[in-house]
Regions:
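N-terminal periplasmic accessory domains that precede
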Residues: 16, 50-57, 73-76, 85-88, ...
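Repeated loop/turn-to-beta-strand initiation elements of outer-membrane beta-barrel proteins
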Residues: 174-177
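Short, glycine-/polar-rich solvent-exposed loops and beta-turns at beta-strand/coil boundaries
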Residues: 60-71, 93, 97-98, 129-133
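Residue-level signature of outer-membrane beta-barrel architecture
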Residues: 79, 168-172
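N-terminal periplasmic "start-of-domain" segments of outer-membrane beta-barrel proteins
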Residues: 13-45, 74
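Transmembrane beta-barrel strands of outer-membrane/channel proteins
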Residues: 152-156, 179-181
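Short acidic/polar hinge/loop motifs at secondary-structure boundaries
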Residues: 93-121
Length: 182
């Protein structure tokens, strides 16, 4: 009886949709290598930074940090330099004008404002521009829920690291908001 109930739960697993072709598709119909993280995976991680969460949960990614804790963090996809990977947040391409190659560092994106991450590995330059030879990282931020909500979290870790997170969100017929502070 326990085995048959497990099979029933397999039918209840929601289908995750992704957007590698800039249109919504089922994960099973995508022809390229894709990793998708939901807010549950992101929130359960012990890391503060989204870059470390991506590195822990995705294959073919290399995280490199230029200095000690809190310094610039870049991600390489499929072994190519970071300049060959593009980062989008809610469909907007992220570029760092202070970077020598225009790439974007992920150290300042904290996990509490992220709803979903899609990592599209492989050549996607026809859809995401010439810098997407290694792949593209699509980050989708959280949206406000109906009503008004707030949340506090306190985290601590090794090397005397501490993190305090606050978020507030809400929505009604006219607007929707989400604010996250670290």
């Amino acid at each position: 009886l326990m085995l048959s109930s497990g099979y029933l739960f397999a039918d209840d697993i929601p289908v995750i949709v992704i957007s590698p072709g800039k249109t919504v598709q089922s994960l099973g119909t995508v022809g390229s290598s894709v990793d998708v993280f939901t807010s549950e995976t992101i929130n359960e991680s012990s890391h503060f930074s989204l870059a470390h969460i991506i590195d822990d949960n995705s294959t073919s990614t290399n995280l490199f940090q230029m200095g000690g804790y809190g310094s610039n963090i870049g991600i390489q996809l499929r072994g190519l330099e970071k300049r060959y990977s593009t980062v989008y947040v809610d469909g907007v391409k992220m570029l760092d004008p202070s970077s020598s190659d225009g790439s974007f560092y992920l150290e300042n994106i904290m996990k509490n404002g992220v709803d979903r991450v899609e990592i599209l590995k492989g050549t996607h330059s026809s859809l995401y521009g010439s810098n997407a030879i290694g792949g593209a990282i699509n980050i989708f931020t959280k949206k406000g829920r109906e009503g008004n909500h707030s949340n506090w979290e306190i985290e601590s870790g090794s090397r005397n690291t501490k993190n305090i997170l606050y978020s507030a969100d809400g929505a009604n017929d006219k607007y929707n908001y989400y604010v996250g502070l670290n």
